[in-house]
């Protein structure tokens, strides 16, 4: 599978499914384009080979804030529910590639819905469940949503009722469906939709995966589109640093509402053939209990939680901690010194920086992939150029290229061509001191920014 081959090119990591020889990628040029692969094909491949492997785990406190049971889904069960839901979506007779909004909190339903929309041949549009009616309306209009999948209850909030108000103001929204209980009148009950739907293999050709839409900075006026292959590539690049093995667990505190949450959570778990456990609503006691559950675990958390985690007695089975930053960001000074007082162990920490919705860059502290080193000298980036490459302009701003950062803006719902080999400019530049990056800052573009100063060249091997 292309994602695993991309990982093996850079580091010999475990794969999502068995049967791919370790030597398969040796001698493969670094700039070979990655073959097309989708999140759904990764789910199906693992479901066929390891049907009893755990795919998604709901948080134990889920009934308290949703009135829905906490379920542990095997890969086989998840694949069946995804196909049932996808068949139901196809029965709506929407044109292929229609935009379907997902306004869900990040529990198992969110993961299954993302996969089902892809399997139905439509575009999943990630709508943060925290958005109010006005922002949801703006997103629906800007993306030209045809349908939305949501949830009846989230704590004291009622997302389905909020979206009913949006549907009354935006007539292009043809279908509104929600997971229950207590689904409002006029809203399709997704639980019934799934249970009453047909099971088994899909009839006829499976529609092509159509990608997804997210929003830059959580702004409904700034939708961007990326293909499913680009999401898989972003997850593959992240896993080079995080090194998640099949059957291990990713415990994520970041919802799949944007690139940073999706690529480090659901997509990473599917690429690695691992388990994903999420915590849509953070609770300290529930988090402590989840962290101490048996089994090798990789934690994905917002970077601001580093101080809290540093003071904890962390379980021995915690293999790594991915601290996810949003640019602009500052690297904590103590993160550069291994074994500092009250600090996390450097070799288990991965810094991940989200450059808007353009790209993710991940590196393990205390190694040659430490982001303070890589962003200090871009030629230290060792990922395959087909996956991601990096340059800095004369004004210091970073630009990305490669399948992991192939993204394009939507203009009133019209999707432009996704640039294959074009550089994706960002407004962010590293702050350098003695050859190290100490922060990422936002800078105004200068007139001479077009000429690159430093390239991260393609790596031909290890």
Predicted regions and their residues:
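Structural core segment of the AMP-binding/adenylate-forming
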Residues: 2, 122-193, 291-322, 459-462
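Conserved AMP-binding/adenylate-forming core of the ANL superfamily
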Residues: 31-35, 55-93, 98, 107, ...
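Conserved pre-ATP/AMP-binding loop-to-beta segment of ANL
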Residues: 36, 51-54, 178, 183, ...
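Conserved AMP-binding/adenylate-forming
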Residues: 68-71, 84-134, 251-259
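Short beta-strand->loop structural element characteristic of the AMP-binding/adenylate-forming
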Residues: 101-103, 110, 114, 118-154, ...
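AMP-binding/adenylate-forming
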Residues: 123, 142-151, 210-214, 221-309
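Gly/Ser/Thr-rich phosphate-binding loop
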Residues: 180-182, 188-196, 298, 310-389, ...
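Conserved ATP-binding/catalytic segment of the ANL
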Residues: 392-462
């Amino acid at each position: 599978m292309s994602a695993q081959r991309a990982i093996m090119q850079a580091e010999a990591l475990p794969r999502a499914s068995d049967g791919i020889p370790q030597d398969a990628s040796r001698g493969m040029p670094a700039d070979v384009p990655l073959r097309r692969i989708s999140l759904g094909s990764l789910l199906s491949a693992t479901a066929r080979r390891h049907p009893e492997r755990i795919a998604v785990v709901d948080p134990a406190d889920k009934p308290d804030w949703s009135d829905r049971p906490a379920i542990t889904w095997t890969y086989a069960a998840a694949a069946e529910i995804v196909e049932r839901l996808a068949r139901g979506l196809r029965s709506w007779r929407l044109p292929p590639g229609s935009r379907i909004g997902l306004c869900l909190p990040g529990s198992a339903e969110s993961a299954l819905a993302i996969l089902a929309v892809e399997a139905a041949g439509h575009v999943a549009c990630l709508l943060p469940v925290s958005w109010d009616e006005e922002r949801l309306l703006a997103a629906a209009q800007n993306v030209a949503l045809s349908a939305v999948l949501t949830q009846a209850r989230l704590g004291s909030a009622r997302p389905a009722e909020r979206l009913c108000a949006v549907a009354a103001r935006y007539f292009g929204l043809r279908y509104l469906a929600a997971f229950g209980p207590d689904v409002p009148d006029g809203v399709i009950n997704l639980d019934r939709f799934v249970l009453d739907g047909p099971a088994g293999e899909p009839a006829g050709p499976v529609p092509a995966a159509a990608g997804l839409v997210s929003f830059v900075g959580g702004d409904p006026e700034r939708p961007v589109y990326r293909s499913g292959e680009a999401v898989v590539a972003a997850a593959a690049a992240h896993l080079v640093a995080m090194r998640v093995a099949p059957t291990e667990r990713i415990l994520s505190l970041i919802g799949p509402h944007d690139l940073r949450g999706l690529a480090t959570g659901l997509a990473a778990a599917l690429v690695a053939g691992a388990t994903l456990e999420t915590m849509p609503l953070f609770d300290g006691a529930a988090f402590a209990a989840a962290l101490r559950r048996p089994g090798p675990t990789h934690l994905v958390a917002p970077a601001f939680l580093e101080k809290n985690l540093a003071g904890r007695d962390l379980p021995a089975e915690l293999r790594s901690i991915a601290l996810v930053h949003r640019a602009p960001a500052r690297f904590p000074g103590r993160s550069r010194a291994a074994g500092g007082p009250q600090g996390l162990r450097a070799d288990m920490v991965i810094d991940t920086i989200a450059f808007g919705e353009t790209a993710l860059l991940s590196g393990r502290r205390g190694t040659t992939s430490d982001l303070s080193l890589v962003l200090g000298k871009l030629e230290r980036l060792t990922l395959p150029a087909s996956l991601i490459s990096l340059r800095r302009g004369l004004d210091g701003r970073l630009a990305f290229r490669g399948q992991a950062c192939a993204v394009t803006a939507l203009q009133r719902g019209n999707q432009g061509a996704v640039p294959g080999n074009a550089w994706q400019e960002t407004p962010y530049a590293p702050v350098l001191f003695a050859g190290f990056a100490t922060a990422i800052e936002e800078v105004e573009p200068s007139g001479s920014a077009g000429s690159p100063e430093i390239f991260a060249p393609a790596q031909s091997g290890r």
